[in-house]
């Protein structure tokens, strides 16, 4: 009887009914090494990742589409007519509206006076609808506003590898950017 009691006690004591939920795991995407070619559009040119497609929206507005990432970079060309400050304020307003969903905003500037290329890039950390926005200007007559969108629900942790990939492409676009004389 004593042995039966001890065996019963050990049987019930060793049963642990608490279970942990199955962790969701995501595979890290593997990207091929990007290859670039020079792309001329409207009155500007830059190095474009060959894994992306350029889609013309209208006259001088384009979309760089990454089919494998289901992501888009919009390039909106605006002609400057002494309204650089006004455009900068509108762009800042757009950044402010987008920042509502961001935990942090990181900025970076780029300038190449020899090519008359000036840029400011905004990186949004968090579940923001657009994780990267930037503009390019010659500060005289040309201004390009740009934003990046993924065709998915904003989930920063899941999108982070894709954001890093596109961020390096955007840096390549900006560093290789050049205005074509009109």
Label each PLM-derived region with a short phrase.
Residues 1-6:
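Sec-dependent signal peptide recognition
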Residues 12-14:
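C-terminal motif of bacterial Sec signal peptides marking the signal peptidase cleavage site
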Residues 16-18:
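Bacterial signal peptide processing site
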Residues 40-95:
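Secretory pathway targeting signatures of secreted, lumenal, and periplasmic proteins
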Residues 52, 147-182:
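Surface-exposed amphipathic alpha-helical segments
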Residues 53, 89-147:
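Signature of long, low-cysteine stretches enriched in small and polar/charged residues
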């Amino acid at each position: 009887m004593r042995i039966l009691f001890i065996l019963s006690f050990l049987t019930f004591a060793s049963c642990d009914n608490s279970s942990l939920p199955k962790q969701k795991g995501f595979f890290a995407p593997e990207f091929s090494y990007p290859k670039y070619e020079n792309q001329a559009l409207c009155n500007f040119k830059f190095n474009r990742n060959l894994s992306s497609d350029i889609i013309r929206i209208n006259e001088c507005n384009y979309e760089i589409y990454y089919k494998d990432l289901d992501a888009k970079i919009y390039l909106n060309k605006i002609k400057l007519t002494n309204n650089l400050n006004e455009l900068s304020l509108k762009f800042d307003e757009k950044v402010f509206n987008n920042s509502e969903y961001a935990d942090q905003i990181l900025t970076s500037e780029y300038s190449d006076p020899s090519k008359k290329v000036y840029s400011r890039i905004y990186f949004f950390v968090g579940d923001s609808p657009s994780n990267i926005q930037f503009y390019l200007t010659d500060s005289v007559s040309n201004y390009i506003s740009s934003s990046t969108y993924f065709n998915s629900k904003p989930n920063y942790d899941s999108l982070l590898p894709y954001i890093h990939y596109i961020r390096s492409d955007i840096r390549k676009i900006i560093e290789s950017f050049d205005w074509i004389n009109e």
